[in-house]
């Protein structure tokens, strides 16, 4: 398993930072814009002015500007890829911001982590599925989150939907011009037991190992740690609902109608939010 984790780390270390001009020319620009709009709305919904935020799997710091616009007071970014953390530091230095920033290169999903403080919001965008590599890894990741989330605080995430992927597998729709999913399945193994797959996304991810999210197990694990599920919604529904509620932001971010193939990529994912319960004595 360590070999696979190293492969994932090296994959993200190898991805070069692309300038805004290059991103705008990408064939996946509409997909990127849709994903960024969804993340911006998710941050708006669950982040208050002055909040402290722990961003797990922060990558190159692509959400820093979203948090600046949300008016947070402190940001702590953690990622397994050292190169990504260095790029995030550069991005933070070069932007106008009013909040404090800290970064740390660490595996927060498979290694015990204690930053010595709690946060109002913990975010995991397109990365928490890596916690499902083993049962032990998931347990460690969930304990890391519970340890660092303030009572009443929110854990917000975007993850691939196992249900969507398996439904497409049954229908034989596992790729288009933008993406490709390859299941690592042996003949005698039932689909319910398959834990991982290979994912490729044009201009972004190249045949990287990803893990299925066991939703029931995740909810049960967080429940034992005092976190309850407050929202679960597929990306397409979330995108359409928030587009109606935030027409100005939608226009500002250059959103348009997604093609069928673009929608297929966006529709792989879902929004999931947990809230840490407040002890009755503190309520």
Curated annotation (Swiss-Prot):
Its EC number is 2.1.1.56. Residues 1-24 have a biased composition (Basic and acidic residues). Changing residue 66 to A: Reduces activity by 80%. The keyword S-adenosyl-L-methionine applies. Keywords: Methyltransferase, mRNA capping, mRNA processing, Nucleus, RNA-binding, S-adenosyl-L-methionine, Transferase. Changing residue 109 to A: Reduces activity by 83%. Strongly reduced activity. Changing residue 66 to Q/R: Reduces activity by 90%. S-adenosyl-L-methionine binds at residues 39, 57, 79, 107, 125, 130. Changing residue 126 to I: Reduces activity by 75%. Disulfide bonds: none annotated. Changing residue 130 to F: Reduces activity by 66%. Changing residue 126 to L: Reduces activity by 55%. Belongs to the class I-like SAM-binding methyltransferase superfamily. mRNA cap 0 methyltransferase family. Monomer. This is mRNA cap guanine-N(7) methyltransferase. It comes from Encephalitozoon cuniculi (strain GB-M1). The lineage of its organism: Eukaryota, Fungi, Fungi incertae sedis, Microsporidia, Unikaryonidae. The gene is ABD1.
